[in-house]
């Protein structure tokens, strides 16, 4: 294995373990607050502090990527997360707002720097496969993390999460090849990066909005369609499995064929697929198949976008675009559940209609951008 591939493998492995840490800690904190008797609005406000941390650190990420090596940024952030998680059992519950804010800051550093680092070290011919593996590994960690709550009672999950962060840091520190700071580019303001990559911003907001709405409301929608709570939860799990597994073949295709045409195809299939939800949910096997493929095709929009961004930008500018994308992710995640709730209140099939509408609008936007960049061809 070449030094370059070893570095990529180490980063992807460390990111999957970080995904476990995040997937464990997010529901853990909410459950502990619920157990202590706090209302949903308080729990939601605490969860929003993670997004506030993301918004706060994003403008500084391009400069950080210039000043420090990616390995140093990631390992120090992982050590910070270790300390923060171990502090939760000893800090008064109101102090958890500050801890959650700092978790958002250091988690954002890890995600932006790893995406930038992988793009910086991969060759163009394998860029999509590498980033598809990254997306799948991170998603796998997110999915498995909550399951660890079933085997660890009390305060143990906080220490378990800290231990996973430590493991990830040690793997990265001892195994990753040395790398210099990512670039010497002149850093631009964060808003400039929004205008430099408008399609990437739209794709990120779309993915975050529907992911947040789906995770919160898909089970409710399926139950309204006559599914039991267990069966509806299994349907959500099938969607998540598809979102993980299908990224690898999408990455393979994206390294061989026109990535923008694949993006348009995924957006079109996501639009049509969402419109089929009401029909498919009447036949369980069709619903499982549809959700499996829809989850994979929809998440592929994000995989293809981060690949396109990596092909177009380098160094601090790449980190800047990813930082701007993370802000759009936060915006999408904040408004997605609200839009979903309003849509479901207005229409029986409001959730799939909303998904189809947003995917359709993104398809039209991507088509317009493609024609503009190709001189109307």
Task: Enumerate the predicted regions with their spans.
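Intracellular juxtamembrane helix-capping segments at the cytosolic ends
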Residues: 109-122, 299-313
């Amino acid at each position: 294995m070449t030094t370059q591939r070893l570095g990529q493998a180490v980063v992807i492995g460390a990111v999957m373990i970080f995904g476990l840490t995040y997937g464990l800690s997010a529901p853990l904190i909410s459950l502990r607050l619920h157990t202590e008797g706090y209302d949903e609005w308080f729990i939601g406000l605490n969860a929003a502090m993670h997004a506030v941390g993301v918004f706060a650190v994003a403008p500084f990420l391009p400069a950080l990527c210039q000043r420090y090596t990616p390995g140093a940024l990631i390992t120090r952030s992982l050590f910070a997360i270790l300390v923060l998680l171990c502090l939760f059992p000893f800090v008064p519950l109101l102090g958890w707002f500050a801890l959650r804010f700092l978790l958002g800051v250091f988690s954002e550093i890890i995600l932006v720097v790893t995406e930038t680092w992988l793009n910086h070290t991969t060759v163009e011919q394998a860029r999509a496969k590498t980033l598809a593996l990254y997306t799948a590994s991170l998603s796998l960690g997110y999915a498995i993390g909550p399951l660890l709550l079933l085997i660890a009672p009390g305060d143990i999950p906080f220490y378990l999460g800290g231990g996973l962060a430590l493991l990830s840091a040690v793997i990265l520190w001892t195994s990753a090849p040395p790398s210099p700071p990512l670039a010497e580019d002149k850093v631009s303001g964060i808003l400039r990066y929004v205008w430099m990559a408008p399609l990437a911003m739209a794709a990120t907001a779309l993915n975050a909005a529907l992911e947040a709405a789906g995770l919160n409301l898909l089970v409710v929608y399926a139950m309204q369609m006559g599914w039991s709570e267990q069966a509806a939860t299994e349907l959500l799990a099938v969607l998540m499995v598809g979102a993980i597994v299908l990224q690898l073949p999408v990455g393979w295709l994206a390294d061989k064929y026109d990535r923008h045409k694949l993006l348009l195809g995924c957006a079109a299939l996501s639009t049509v697929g969402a419109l089929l939800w009401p029909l498919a949910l009447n036949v369980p096997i069709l619903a499982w198949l549809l959700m499996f493929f829809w989850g994979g095709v929809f998440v592929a929009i994000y995989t293809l976008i981060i690949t396109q961004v990596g092909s177009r930008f380098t160094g601090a500018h790449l980190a800047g675009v990813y930082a701007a994308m993370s802000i759009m992710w936060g915006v999408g995640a904040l408004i997605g559940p609200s839009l979903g709730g309003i849509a479901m209140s207005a229409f029986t099939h409001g959730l799939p209609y909303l998904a189809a509408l947003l995917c359709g609008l993104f398809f039209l936007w991507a088509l317009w951008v493609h024609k503009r960049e190709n001189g109307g061809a």
